[in-house]
A protein has these predicted regions:
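Extended, well-ordered protein cores
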Residues: 1-224, 233-238, 250-257
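Non-transmembrane, aqueous-exposed alpha-helical and coiled segments at domain scale
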Residues: 167-172, 181-182, 186, 193-218, ...
Length: 758
């Protein structure tokens, strides 16, 4: 009886044939819920009662479904998709997405989670039949933090092809498996697009047929490549075209007409900016001074392959992937770079393809399937292990624990945890046998080209032991950053074609011509974000009070769960204050991201992005060849979001994550006043120019001196922002008016600065 009631509830909500307006549907739903609740009183088992009530709540939280859509011949579709407002379900694990879409068919199950209406992230081919949502939730959590540097918030999708195991058992080759994965991928994307709004040529939002909506317009859906789907972007864009979706080939970035991450090497190059900063702050130039590296990955992969070619001073002594273990105890940087480059260009290469004559004495390539591996004296010395014979798992553990200068993650898997975490909590069963604790690592620096190489607690344990590390979200943000630039550029170019400012035939050549500039814009974000973390690290334990207040403020708003994010509670913070122990870089990275995300929301809902001064901010966001389309640019559908993203990043990068809320409280101003004051202060005192001059001193002066100069500029900027927000910004104020009022005096003061300040 109860199940029939649930089906009736679903039909009352979503069957188009039921007719009636929204109010009458809501009334019918209310009556059915009351009736079901009465029926539930008769359920004898507490467990059954709880399960049924959760199902009622689930149906109530569904906002759309394709269940009542049909194909051209009138048949029901062979797949079902439902869209759920996850935050309406009390029992879901944290963090709860804004929306999730579940897609089911006999041959595939998948889920797409996103944290806001404008969200982006990859779709992965999952091999975790029973807990792919857990996998995707962990990934989207990292994606949400990573996306602080771009316009959309985080999203992630994962699909499990259910017939794949049978194909493998039947002896199906790689091509047969790939074909089945593509079939599942197509169904998954169709399920997502079935219930997503569209935008017509007039700019009006249109809705899918036979879909009853219990929410507002929702037309923004973009996807990206991920594990197992690196070559699927053109397939996705073909499906987008079949649906007439407004984003066309901006739907899936990185296709044949787009910015290919592997060709650009953008993810690895971004991670390398982080690695270079770590070493630069240790006084070492890794582009010219040889340094030892161990890693996870192989040269055929995007992130590892590109990464291990970014310096000709690399001495890669050991690495492993899912097939082989590579050890070169004393590599020659020049010849080993040439060999890695050859392997990178070799299709589907593995470590077994490495020219053994190029490996130094005692080294070799060993299959992970071997029963045991005999170790040479050279291997024992470079990895600092005593055994003469070990199994592959022990050898891989030794590589992770090796006393190398850099440990670089470029492959799939979670290899480092904290002592208090269990392998089950980590959720990566395949690597349980080789996982180590963060405090045991002996590398000086960790570069996270890959996602989830360490747990957050593992990162913190490594940092507390003196290691230099950020987070995967900081280190490998360049891929998603590049994709976001591509989407926003394609939206602009589409508008330029529609307005007649650009010919359709010129589109693809224009996109290709901007590849290098897009790459440089993305890498600037990696440089700036890692610098922001370094400046906060320099603040030390003295910043703990303001950081604690910021976390309390976010927690009170329901925006931050410290336990979920691995941030210390008040008791642990008190202990750190007593010990003079500051937050670690991984913790600071999380605070930085939360500050940017929160500030973005505040700015985009304020009047600040509409200030005329920020028209040029928008123009500078795009590559130079697009400046001629400024009229279309100012009508860009995401204009305010792009400007708000730029401003939230600049404010937090230059002034710190706790600054925005402290400034608003102390100056008693709103967000718009703070933003205008910040931008005016930067321009009045020409602080951007000063900041860039300090950045130009990389490796020319000691890192400590460089940091001190940045801190001086930041202090001036914070003080002048406060003064302007408190004293000068009034209703109707503009950035240009503030600059005109105060810059002449500031320039005059600069001209005689030495004599005045002495």
């Amino acid at each position: 009886v109860e199940f029939r009631g649930l089906l009736a509830l679903f039909a009352a909500k979503f069957d188009p044939a039921a007719g009636g307006d929204a109010a009458s549907r809501e009334a019918a739903v209310g009556k059915l819920v009351a009736k079901i609740n009465d029926l539930l009183q008769e359920v004898k088992s507490l467990d059954h009662d709880r399960a049924l009530r959760r199902m009622v709540l689930l149906v109530q939280a569904i906002k759309r479904t394709n269940y009542y859509q049909t194909t051209a011949d009138g048949a029901h579709k062979a797949h079902i998709s439902i869209k759920i407002a996850s935050r309406e379900l009390a029992d879901l694990p944290l963090p709860k997405p804004f929306r999730e879409i579940f897609v089911w068919a006999p041959h595939i199950e998948g889920v797409h989670l996103r944290f806001g209406p404008v969200a982006r992230g990859g779709l992965r081919w999952s091999d975790r039949r029973d807990d792919f949502r857990t996998e995707v939730l962990g990934l989207v959590k990292a994606q949400q933090v990573k996306n602080a540097v771009i316009v959309p918030v985080g999203s992630k999708g994962g699909f499990f092809p259910k017939h794949l195991a049978a194909i493998v058992r039947a002896g199906g080759d790689r091509d047969a498996q790939q074909a089945e994965a593509i079939r599942a991928y197509r169904t998954f994307l169709s399920g997502l697009l079935d219930i997503t709004d569209n935008i017509d040529k007039s700019g009006a939002v249109t809705h899918p047929q036979n879909v009853v909506r219990f929410e507002g317009d929702d037309p923004y859906l973009v996807v990206a490549a991920d594990k197992g789907t690196a070559t699927f972007s053109d397939i996705a864009n073909g499906i987008s075209a079949d649906y007439g979706f407004w984003l066309d080939d901006a739907f899936a970035s990185g296709g044949s007409v787009g910015y290919d991450h592997k060709v650009m090497g953008i993810t690895a190059r971004g991670a390398w900016e982080a690695v270079k900063r770590h070493f630069r702050e240790m006084g070492k130039d890794i582009q010219s001074e040889p340094f030892t590296v161990v890693g996870v990955g192989d040269m055929s992969g995007d992130v590892f392959g590109n990464g291990m070619l970014l310096s000709k001073a690399i001495k890669l002594v050991a690495a492993f992937d899912h097939r082989d273990i590579f050890i070169d105890p004393n590599p020659d940087p020049a010849s080993s770079w040439v060999e890695r480059d050859r392997m990178f260009k070799l299709p589907r290469s593995s470590w077994q393809d490495y020219d053994k004559s190029k490996i130094s004495k005692g080294g070799g390539v060993f299959p992970r399937s071997a029963k045991s591996i005999e170790l040479s004296p050279e291997i024992k010395a470079v990895l600092d292990i005593q055994e003469d014979v070990v199994d592959p798992a022990t050898l891989m553990k030794a590589i992770l624990l090796a006393p190398a200068e850099l440990l670089y993650f470029g492959g799939i898997g979670t290899y480092v945890k904290a002592p208090h975490e269990t392998d089950a909590q980590v959720g990566d069963k395949a690597n349980d046998a080789i996982r180590v604790d963060g405090g045991e690592l002996r590398a000086k620096v960790i570069g996270e080209g890959a996602n989830l190489g360490l747990t957050q607690a593992g990162r913190i344990a490594f940092a507390m032991s003196g290691g230099r590390i950020n987070t995967d979200a900081i280190d490998n943000s360049a891929g998603v950053d590049s994709s976001d630039h591509e989407v926003n550029i394609k939206i602009l170019i589409g508008a330029a074609i529609a307005s007649g400012a650009l010919k359709t035939g010129d589109r693809n050549a224009l996109l290709a011509s901007m590849t290098d500039e897009v790459g440089l814009k993305v890498l600037a974000h990696n440089y700036d974000q890692t610098l922001a973390v370094s400046l906060q690290e320099d603040d030390g334990a003295g910043a703990l009070d303001s950081q604690q207040q910021f976390m309390l403020w976010l927690g009170a708003k329901g925006k931050l769960d410290r336990k979920v994010e691995g941030l210390p509670d008040d008791v642990k913070l008190a202990e750190r204050k007593l010990a003079g122990q500051a937050l670690t870089r991984p913790e600071l990275a999380v605070l930085t991201a939360y500050s940017k995300l929160e500030l973005f929301d505040d700015i985009v809902s304020s009047t600040a992005p509409d200030d005329p001064f920020f028209k040029q901010t928008l123009v500078r966001y795009f590559p130079a060849p697009l400046a001629k389309f400024e009229a279309d640019m100012q009508r860009h559908r995401l204009r305010r979001e792009i400007v708000s993203t730029i401003l939230s990043n600049e404010i937090v990068n230059m002034c710190g994550p706790t600054f925005p809320e402290r400034l608003r409280q102390s100056a008693r101003c709103d967000t718009a006043a703070m933003v205008l004051a910040f931008e005016a202060a930067r321009q009045i005192f020409r602080l951007d120019q000063a900041w860039d001059e300090v950045s130009a001193l990389d490796l020319k002066i000691p890192a400590e001196a460089q940091t001190a100069l940045y801190q001086e500029i930041s202090m001036v900027l914070r003080r002048q922002t406060f003064w302007l927000a408190r004293r000068a910004v009034r209703p109707g104020s503009t950035v240009e008016a503030l600059i005109a009022a105060y810059q002449p005096a500031a320039d005059a003061l600069r001209a005689v600065g030495g004599s005045v300040l002495s």
